Design a protein with these regions (language model features):
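Sec-dependent signal peptide recognition
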Residues: 2-11
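Mature, well-folded catalytic/scaffold domains that follow N-terminal targeting or propeptide regions
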Residues: 35, 39-40, 166-177, 182-190, ...
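Catalytic phosphate/nucleotide-handling subdomain of diverse soluble enzymes
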Residues: 48, 52, 59-83, 219-222, ...
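Active-site-surrounding "flap" and adjacent substrate/cofactor-binding loops of secreted or lumenal enzymes
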Residues: 55-101, 116-118, 140, 150-153
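Extracytoplasmic mature domains of secreted/periplasmic and thylakoid-lumen proteins
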Residues: 110-112, 116, 126-187, 198
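Accessory "access/gating" subregions that flank catalytic or transport cores
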Residues: 163-184, 193-203, 212-217, 231-347
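Acidic, carboxylate-rich catalytic segments that either coordinate divalent cations
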Residues: 268-311, 364-434
Length: 434
């Protein structure tokens, strides 16, 4: 009997150990310290890319309609004189403005812009209201308090329309409903919500839940789908897979996110078309010219913005700027400097794709690697009051503090929403795989 008893004990111990191993494999462990550095990299990379892309914003939109801007920029224009945008008249002297990286030294301060300030506001609101999912009234309260009522308030198209509706007492998601907001298919949601992906590491399905109402505040249809694509990419940036390069990593993230685009809609077709151009070996300028011809001249794949005769031929539209962003995504190959350069020269709302990829790549490689790539030490100070209002400390913040605030959001999401754990001894998160 003792032999059988010992065998039973050994078998039970084996089953217990197997169960422990399985439970360990059911969790993904992420360093909170490393993640904080990555969030710093997100804000720094996004700021560099945003301010660089702003130099050429709306300089080049094509030659359809009343506004014609001539040939698009090419790599030969990098370092050259910045041409006038569609808003600038002949009285503006731009002879001393060059198309080059826009950087801030340690003594300077990064200013906010519409590609960073709404994300900053949403992070602030999540902690202010101690929640993981903002309610319609919380979003409206935040917009009314932190966005200036009078121009210049750095809102455009759908964001401005949603803000006007909020001031009339209308709550999200009705502010993005096509019957209320004729700009629902513009770019706005895809440049204001990417950060929600970083609040739900490795779990894009919950990131989409967090971002759903902020996205629907200004977008529907394909514009909503594009915004969700970016959110998904940012969530998958925390995946535990091992890659040989940032290029391999970001291409995997992109292809995984592509699986959730509807094959019947133009975002998926734009993705597949642009990826095919990249794989064909043609230069990025040829790829950019091809998407211009296909989507704005020929109106293929159901993208018919040109037929609507909009101002600047819909240069603010979600679709053409998404296609443009894919050019810098693929051809940038995960190199932050190369990606920002291509995005800046690609045309249309050039600060939008650059900001998105600058932030994502900045997150992937972190603060130190960004500074190594640019061979400089950057400012960590950030002035949210350049474009928004009513934040603490007269709007002066730092990337260190902004990263710490992001960690607070993730802590709450991991424990309360993902049913994971915070290991304060190891300073890690244990996040269930599902």
């Amino acid at each position: 009997m003792s032999v059988f008893k010992n065998l039973f004990i050994l078998w039970s111990l084996f089953l217990f150990m197997s169960s422990c191993n399985n439970n360990t494999n059911d969790f993904i462990e992420i360093s909170r310290e490393k993640y904080s550095n990555q969030l710093y990299g997100f804000w720094l990379g996004q700021s560099i890319a945003n301010w660089t892309g702003l130099i050429t914003e709306m300089d080049k939109i094509g030659n359809i309609g009343d506004i014609k801007t001539g040939s698009f920029y090419t790599r030969e224009d990098w370092g050259g004189i910045d041409l006038r945008s569609i808003w600038e008249d002949q009285s503006i002297d731009k002879s001393n403005i060059r198309i080059d990286y826009s950087l801030r030294s340690e003594e300077e301060v990064w200013g906010s812009d519409d590609d960073t300030d709404i994300e900053y506001m949403y992070q602030f609101l999540l902690n202010y209201f101690d929640t993981s999912i903002l309610s319609p009234s919380q979003i409206r309260e935040g917009w009314i308090k932190h966005i200036k009522a009078e121009e210049e308030n750095y809102l455009w198209v759908s964001n401005q329309r949603a803000f006007d509706l909020m001031n009339q007492g209308i709550l999200p998601p009705e502010t993005g409903e096509p019957s209320n907001n004729e700009f629902y298919n513009m770019i706005d949601a895809q440049l204001t919500t990417e950060i929600f992906g970083l609040f739900s590491p490795t779990r894009p399905e919950f990131a989409i839940r967090m971002a759903e109402l902020p996205i629907k505040t200004t977008a529907r249809g394909e514009a909503q789908e594009i915004a969700e694509f970016y959110v998904r990419m940012h969530s998958l940036a925390s995946n535990p897979k091992e890659f040989n390069s940032t290029k391999e990593n970001i291409f995997w993230i992109a292809n995984e996110s592509r699986k959730y685009l509807s094959d019947n809609n133009y975002p998926a077709k734009m993705y597949d078309f642009t990826e095919g151009l990249y794989n064909s070996g043609i230069k990025w300028e040829q790829a950019r010219d091809s998407i211009y011809s296909r989507y704005q001249v020929e109106q293929k794949d159901g993208y018919d913005i040109t037929s609507k005769n909009l101002y600047c031929n819909g240069c603010f539209a979600a679709g053409i700027n998404f296609a443009s962003s894919l050019v810098s995504l693929f051809y940038g190959e995960g190199d932050i400097k190369k990606t920002i350069k291509i995005g800046t020269l690609s045309g249309w709302d050039s600060d939008n794709p650059t900001s998105t990829w600058g932030g994502l790549i900045g997150f992937l490689i972190g603060k130190e690697m960004i500074e190594r790539e640019f061979n400089t030490n950057f400012s960590s100070k950030f002035n949210i009051h350049r474009t928004r209002q009513n934040f603490p400390n007269k709007g002066i913040d730092s990337f260190i503090h902004m990263a710490a605030e992001g960690i607070k959001v993730v802590d709450r999401v991991v424990e309360e929403e993902l049913k994971g754990e915070i290991n304060l001894i190891k300073n890690t998160w244990l996040i269930p795989v599902k």
